[in-house]
């Protein structure tokens, strides 16, 4: 099932929008091999995942049981990597299970709480097992966040707007929360009040993140993934925006994460940490 010397990869959530792109990218990478594909879609069980994603047969059946694949992977000379693009309700258990079987997780599913991330870090440390948790695999988004950090030196007012397709289950997005966290870690408080505000509808001013940063979430069909970071000062507005037009833009980051996680022994959060 594996190519000699290649990193075995299990794609969890393989029939989803992101999972399909990961399957294609892994199948085309010479130093990776698709060890297994997992998805709970009952209509696709047993089908060749290559046929499901439209690239021809890969001789890898789509299965529903993640644990059985992790058991099989643990018996390989190199246990490899599990890439998880599933659901906020299942990702925590998926990651713990992978670590327990010696398979390194690369996590693209958002929705993990800070407490869950800390618990996974403790679990991974005890196992000396690498794990990457990455809210956004886009190089462009990393550049936007770096530009926002630089801009925050000169602006005291900032708000974040994130826009996603209406199938996204969590809000705010992990990327927006990460952006707010990066700005909050700079040691300043944003958006000093100019007036006493009254919300006539609950949530009209968005959700309040750390250090006074507000995040607004939009969910509509037709969107993929978009984020604006808007800075304001008297007489000027500075807007940073990143737009995703195709999910293939995430694949260079996913492939980099698969390769990098093999040399880690703890949890690392954010693509910028491995660039």
From Swiss-Prot:
The active site is at residues 164, 168. GO terms for biological process: diaminopimelate biosynthetic process; lysine biosynthetic process via diaminopimelate. Keywords: Amino-acid biosynthesis, Cytoplasm, Diaminopimelate biosynthesis, Lysine biosynthesis, NAD, NADP, Oxidoreductase. Coiled coil: none annotated. NAD(+) binds at residues 13-18, 108-110. The keyword Transmembrane does not apply. SUPFAM superfamilies: Glyceraldehyde-3-phosphate dehydrogenase-like, C-terminal domain, NAD(P)-binding Rossmann-fold domains. It is found in: Cytoplasm. GO terms for molecular function: 4-hydroxy-tetrahydrodipicolinate reductase; NAD binding; NADP binding; oxidoreductase activity, acting on CH or CH2 groups, NAD or NADP as acceptor. It comes from the Bacteria. The keyword Amino-acid biosynthesis applies. Pathway: Amino-acid biosynthesis; L-lysine biosynthesis via DAP pathway; (S)-tetrahydrodipicolinate from L-aspartate: step 4/4. CDD domains: DHDPR_N. It catalyses: (S)-2,3,4,5-tetrahydrodipicolinate + NAD(+) + H2O = (2S,4S)-4-hydroxy-2,3,4,5-tetrahydrodipicolinate + NADH + H(+); (S)-2,3,4,5-tetrahydrodipicolinate + NADP(+) + H2O = (2S,4S)-4-hydroxy-2,3,4,5-tetrahydrodipicolinate + NADPH + H(+). Its EC number is 1.17.1.8. (S)-2,3,4,5-tetrahydrodipicolinate binds at residues 165, 174-175. GO terms for cellular component: cytosol. Belongs to the DapB family. Catalyzes the conversion of 4-hydroxy-tetrahydrodipicolinate (HTPA) to tetrahydrodipicolinate. This is 4-hydroxy-tetrahydrodipicolinate reductase. It comes from Cyanothece sp. (strain PCC 7425 / ATCC 29141). The lineage of its organism: Bacteria, Bacillati, Cyanobacteriota, Cyanophyceae, Gomontiellales. The gene is dapB.
């Amino acid at each position: 099932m594996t190519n000699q010397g290649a990193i075995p990869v299990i794609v969890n959530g393989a029939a989803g929008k992101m999972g399909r792109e990961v399957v294609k990218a892994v199948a085309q990478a010479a130093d990776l091999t698709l060890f297994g594909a997992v998805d709970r879609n009952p209509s696709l069980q047993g089908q060749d995942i290559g046929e499901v994603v439209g690239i021809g047969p890969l001789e890898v059946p789509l299965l529903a049981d993640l644990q059985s694949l992790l058991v099989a992977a643990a018996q390989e000379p190199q246990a490899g990597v599990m890439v998880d693009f599933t659901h906020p309700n299942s990702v925590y258990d998926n990651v713990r299970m992978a670590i327990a079987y010696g398979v390194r997780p690369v996590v693209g599913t958002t929705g993990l709480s800070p407490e869950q991330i800390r618990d996974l870090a403790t679990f991974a440390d005890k196992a000396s097992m690498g794990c990457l948790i990455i809210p956004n695999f886009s190089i462009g988004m990393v550049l936007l966040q770096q530009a926002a950090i630089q801009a925050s030196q000169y602006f005291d007012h900032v708000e974040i707007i994130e826009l996603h397709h209406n199938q996204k289950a969590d809000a705010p997005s992990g990327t927006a929360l990460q952006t707010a966290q990066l700005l909050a870690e700079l040691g300043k408080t944003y958006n000093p009040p100019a007036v006493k505000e009254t919300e006539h509808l609950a949530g009209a001013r968005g959700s309040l993140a750390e250090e006074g940063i507000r995040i607004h979430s939009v969910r509509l069909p037709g969107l993929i993934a978009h984020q604006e970071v808007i800075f304001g000062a008297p007489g000027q507005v500075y807007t940073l925006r990143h737009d995703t037009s195709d999910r293939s833009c995430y694949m260079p980051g996913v492939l980099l994460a698969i390769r990098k996680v093999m040399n880690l022994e703890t949890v690392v959060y954010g693509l910028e940490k491995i660039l």
